[in-house]
């Protein structure tokens, strides 16, 4: 398959640059992966689509304020975007400046903090904090929320809350698991009251999620690596759910990738998993665990639209996106959502 097969023209006004006033006020496009049938709904209608005994799996990563501003010793300005935290003092990061900082040079951050350029790893820089504080403490003090490039505005105070799920727990993501942004506490309580089971995995979404695919042939793409954790209690819940003939519903592509990574690591039989994953899901992939998913509308030619196409069928997904454009759904991180059931292979 060609990467350009996943292209579509999106009017600029359909890119959501701000979230809705209420989390669950978004629209919801449902797609039946077997038939291609579409239905226009509200996100709150999801309550009627998830059945008692179904298991919903959420990604509980917490977005860190991963964008830092500062200057080199020479006075040149730079911008740092954390890719991942290596430990309490060291990060791997993208650095934007007129000239790359040299090894052992000092970077002066806003707020008076300093970092040393320790090493370079291809396009990423290893930076070391020169402070008694931890990286996380400095990020919380002077970091900015790492809004995606297409939102095309400076971050605001409201983004600290809204570019974050209500159930976030484990700091480490530099992009939000956006399907989860639609859920508020009341909706989670309503799902539980209905008898829906809730479980949490962790995948620290990296900045690589916004990198364009730079090859023509889908098969030649090398996926970026992210850290994921699927604990034993989730594995047990999935086994019980499958045994009872109920569905595993993944909230977001990151939850899908976490569960399928765990299944891949143990060759199909799901076992607990913790470590880096570079799983790349595109049409032809056989899903082992997930039966239905909730996801936002993704960028053209992105690995995320490829994943959804693998799940529900390429033709069905591309037709759904054209429908969404015609019906003026809101796209990308702060936009509307889809509820998609898996196409039988």
From Swiss-Prot:
The keyword Transferase applies. One of its GO terms (cellular component) is cytoplasm. Its EC number is 2.4.99.17. GO terms for biological process: queuosine biosynthetic process; tRNA wobble guanine modification. Its main location: cytoplasm. It is found in: Cytoplasm. The keyword Protease does not apply. Pathway: tRNA modification; tRNA-queuosine biosynthesis. It catalyses: 7-aminomethyl-7-carbaguanosine(34) in tRNA + S-adenosyl-L-methionine = epoxyqueuosine(34) in tRNA + adenine + L-methionine + 2 H(+). Keywords: Cytoplasm, Queuosine biosynthesis, S-adenosyl-L-methionine, Transferase. SUPFAM superfamilies: QueA-like. InterPro entries: QueA (IPR003699), QueA_dom1 (IPR042118), QueA_dom2 (IPR042119), QueA_sf (IPR036100). GO terms for molecular function: S-adenosylmethionine:tRNA ribosyltransferase-isomerase activity. Monomer. Transfers and isomerizes the ribose moiety from AdoMet to the 7-aminomethyl group of 7-deazaguanine (preQ1-tRNA) to give epoxyqueuosine (oQ-tRNA). Belongs to the QueA family. PANTHER family: S-ADENOSYLMETHIONINE:TRNA RIBOSYLTRANSFERASE-ISOMERASE. NCBIfam families: PRK00147.1, queA. HAMAP family: QueA (MF_00113). This is S-adenosylmethionine:tRNA ribosyltransferase-isomerase. It comes from Shewanella sp. (strain MR-4).
């Amino acid at each position: 398959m060609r990467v350009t097969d996943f292209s579509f023209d999106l009017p600029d006004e359909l890119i959501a640059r701000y979230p809705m006033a209420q989390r669950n006020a978004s629209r919801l496009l449902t797609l039946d992966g077997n038939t291609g049938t579409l239905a226009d709904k509200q996100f709150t209608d999801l309550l009627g689509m998830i059945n008692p005994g179904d298991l919903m799996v959420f990604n509980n990563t917490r977005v860190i304020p991963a964008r830092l501003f500062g200057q080199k010793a020479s006075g040149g300005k730079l911008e740092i975007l954390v890719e991942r935290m290596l430990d309490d003092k060291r990060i791997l990061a993208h650095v934007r400046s007129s000239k790359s900082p040299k090894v052992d040079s000092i970077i002066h951050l806003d707020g008076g903090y300093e970092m040393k350029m320790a090493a370079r790893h291809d396009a990423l820089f290893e930076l070391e904090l020169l402070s008694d504080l931890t990286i996380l403490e400095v990020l919380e003090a002077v970091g900015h929320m790492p809004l995606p490039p297409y939102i095309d505005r400076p971050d605001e105070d409201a983004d600290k809350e809204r570019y974050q799920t209500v159930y976030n727990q484990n700091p480490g993501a530099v992009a939000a698991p956006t399907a989860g942004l639609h859920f508020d506490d009341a909706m989670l309580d309503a799902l539980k009251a209905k008898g829906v089971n809730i479980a949490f995995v962790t995948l620290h979404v990296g900045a690589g999620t916004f990198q364009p695919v730079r090859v023509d042939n889908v098969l030649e793409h090398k996926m970026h690596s992210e850290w994921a954790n699927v604990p034993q209690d989730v594995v047990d819940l999935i086994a019980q759910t499958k045994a009872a003939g109920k569905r595993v519903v993944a909230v977001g592509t990151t939850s899908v990738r976490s569960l399928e990574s765990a299944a891949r690591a143990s060759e199909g039989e799901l076992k607990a998993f913790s470590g880096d994953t570079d799983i790349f899901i595109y049409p032809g992939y056989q899903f082992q665990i997930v039966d239905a998913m909730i996801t936002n509308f993704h960028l053209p030619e992105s690995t995320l639209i490829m994943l959804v196409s693998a799940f529900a069928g390429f033709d069905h997904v591309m037709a759904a996106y054209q429908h969404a454009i015609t019906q003026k759904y809101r796209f990308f991180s702060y936009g509307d959502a889809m509820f998609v059931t898996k196409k039988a292979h």
